[in-house]
């Protein structure tokens, strides 16, 4: 834009505006896939048998609390308030690459599952050695459960269920860490048709 302004409005001579040659890529469409209740049961069942003792808790953290994989791997016991059911997420990054800290709520079953885990030497709750290792265990679990969805779908599942339970948009954004509400609206747009039909019916 600055180059075009200089050429068009200020009559500055430049051989060409190279910026105009850059193709602007369209943002990929959000798939909106959510994990069904039956799929959740199957995933948690097989996660309980995984060599990764933390996998069941990780799936719950995604579905119940909307944590990103990186946030799970960075979560430490010292940042969890077991009495208040909250966790402080430190140095998390949103899509704008701005580093932030935020405090989120944890579900009762997440609290109970975390309490069952063996304490690690480095204080982390989800002790995956890397993102790749995390996804390898997830792939094994989802294949055994007969589920084809990505782990990121756990966050979409949280958003959809929260919307169905009449959470306010700002509350969901605070929990998920979304800075762009328009991105979050995409999750809302994928609500199940049966649920929306019932909402309309109740308006009558």
Residue ranges of predicted features:
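Short, charged phosphate-coordinating catalytic segments
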Residues: 4-17, 60-84, 170, 174
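DNA/chromatin major-groove-contacting recognition/catalytic segments
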Residues: 99-105, 174, 186-204
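N-terminal core-binding DNA-recognition domain of tyrosine site-specific recombinases/integrases
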Residues: 1-4, 11-15, 29, 50-53, ...
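Non-catalytic DNA-binding core/recognition domains of DNA-processing enzymes
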Residues: 1-7, 22, 106
């Amino acid at each position: 834009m600055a180059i075009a302004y200089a050429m068009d409005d200020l009559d500055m001579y430049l051989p060409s505006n190279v910026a105009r040659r850059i193709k602007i890529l369209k943002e990929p469409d959000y798939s909106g896939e959510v994990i069904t209740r039956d799929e959740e049961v199957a995933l948690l069942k097989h996660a309980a048998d995984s060599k990764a003792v933390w996998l069941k808790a990780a799936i719950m953290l995604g579905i119940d609390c909307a944590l990103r994989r990186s946030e799970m791997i960075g979560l430490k016991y010292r940042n969890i308030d077991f009495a208040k059911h909250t966790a402080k997420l430190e140095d998390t990054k949103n899509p704008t690459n701005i580093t932030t800290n935020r405090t989120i709520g944890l579900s009762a079953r997440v609290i109970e599952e975390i309490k069952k885990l063996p304490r690690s030497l480095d204080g982390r709750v989800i002790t995956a050695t890397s993102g790749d290792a995390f996804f390898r265990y997830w792939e094994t679990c989802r294949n055994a459960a007969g589920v084809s969805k990505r782990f990121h779908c756990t966050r979409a599942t949280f958003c959809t269920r929260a919307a169905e339970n009449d959470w306010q948009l700002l509350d969901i954004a605070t929990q998920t860490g979304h800075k762009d509400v328009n991105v979050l609206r995409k999750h809302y747009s994928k609500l199940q048709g049966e649920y929306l039909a019932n909402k309309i019916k109740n308006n009558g």
